[in-house]
Amino acid sequence: MFSFLKKKKKTPIFEIDSPKISLTPNTVDFISILEKFEINYTCVTNGYITFSAHVFDYAHPLMLGIHYNPLKIEFIEIFRPMEYYQQDAYDINVSFSELSEILIKKYGKPLITTSASINGYPCEQWRTTDYIVNHYIMDRFGPEEHLHINFYKS
């Protein structure tokens, strides 16, 4: 009836703590944003870049992998730097618990928690107004911890 009465949809945002960057599903110029902040990044393959950043109010830097096509960000994955996995004391269960606690501090209790969903490994999910956070362990070439940010479809 009155088009001006329609509520405008809010653009979903994922905030990176440091450097202070806001990503939306439609952010297609993030490479120029990274260059503006003089952030070293790696083009792993066409449609996938990685870089180090601080997220979730966590004191240590994590790696962000952005999977994208020319029109939008498909999803963001967050993982520890390679050096972390190469430590003799690395324990995937300890790592999972630590990141889980960080996510609980940031988002509260997970909406979904299973102790043995994928090959007996834990899985958690949070839903915000902007995106879904999936944190899980899966076994491809040995156990791997995954943390994915998926924007809601608009």
Give the residues covered by each predicted segment.
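Short helix/turn-capping signatures at newly exposed starts of structured segments
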Residues: 1-122, 138-154
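Low-complexity, intrinsically disordered Gly/Pro/Thr-rich segments
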Residues: 128-139
